[in-house]
Amino acid sequence: MLANGATRRGESGAVYSFIEPLGENARSRRNVWLIEEEGKSNVEFIAKGPSTEDDKSLGWPAFQHELKMQRLFNKDKMIRPMVDLIPSSATDEPMMVLKPFEQTLWEARNARPMTTSEIKWIMEGVLLGLQTVHQKGLVYTDLKMENVGITGFDNDKPNENIREIIVRIADCGSISEPGRREISSLTYRSPEVYFGKSWNQSTDIWSWGIILAQLLLAQVDFKSPGMYDAISTGKLEDKTQVARKAMATDFDLFSIPLYAEEEDSASLLPREQPGPDDIYGWAVDMSEKGISGEDLQFLVDVLNPRPDVRPTAAEIMSGGYLKVQLPPK
């Protein structure tokens, strides 16, 4: 097992010193490390190896898939780049050497309320990252604030120049072709996934819309949990059922044939249909807290429970909502 102070050589010839393991389970897992390139003062990177669940006997397929995706997108500016690969040895597993970022979007969201310009700038960066993935016919599948890297965000006060905020999509391990299996974290999961439908690039747009809704809500009610973030107790299946029921009510899935008229999904709908005052209650709540009509209309368009009419990344980019006044370069 790797220990603090260990050194390993990458394919580039660079030698890296392992400083400390990172992550919530750093002591037991030790597959993600902060490392430093020897001979270069304060040149730090992130080293990421196979997880403990990855099958070594099969050559770490999950790691190999993520490595393949990193190489596929390595020249795309909106994806966190891989700078080197540390090959496996008789005693150690392979590790990707990744460019670091200062914090995740989740950490930035919890630092302070963001300005409207900051929110739109960051969300445009995330959308550009998704568009990069979508243009290759692939789906990111696990978009959440924790998978967005942020550098240059001032945690104490609004950035005077939002160009200083650099946004990158991180963690390419979940990128895949369109499918039907269960994907995404509960908070960011789209209705089509919750109800067992096939999904494509539009599921990423739903997740993107949930992030936007959470950032806008934090602007006016900083301590409030975001949409579907309050579902945090109980077993996974119990939480899934609670979220599915809430979504069926919030977006009136009973009235949409895709969910109500097909047996596999209709059986997952709650027994009691919501009353007219319950439908789109989330939008009413956000309006009462001060979210503008323009923002709410945009969210209603993006968070359309019908994936076939949800806007694409390109359509959102050209629609003008994300446009902000930028300072001169």
Question: Residue ranges of each PLM-predicted region?
Answer:
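Conserved activation segment of eukaryotic-like protein kinases, specifically the C-terminal portion
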Residues: 179-193
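C-terminal lobe substrate-recognition/regulatory segment of protein kinase catalytic domains
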Residues: 248-298
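Conserved catalytic-loop aspartate of Hanks-type protein kinases
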Residues: 204
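Short beta-strand micro-motifs within the conserved protein kinase catalytic domain, predominantly
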Residues: 81-94
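Structural motif in protein kinase domains
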Residues: 100-110
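Catalytic-loop of the protein kinase fold
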Residues: 134-161
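ATP-binding glycine-rich loop module of kinase domains
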Residues: 15-72
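Activation segment signature within eukaryotic-like protein kinase domains
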Residues: 122-123
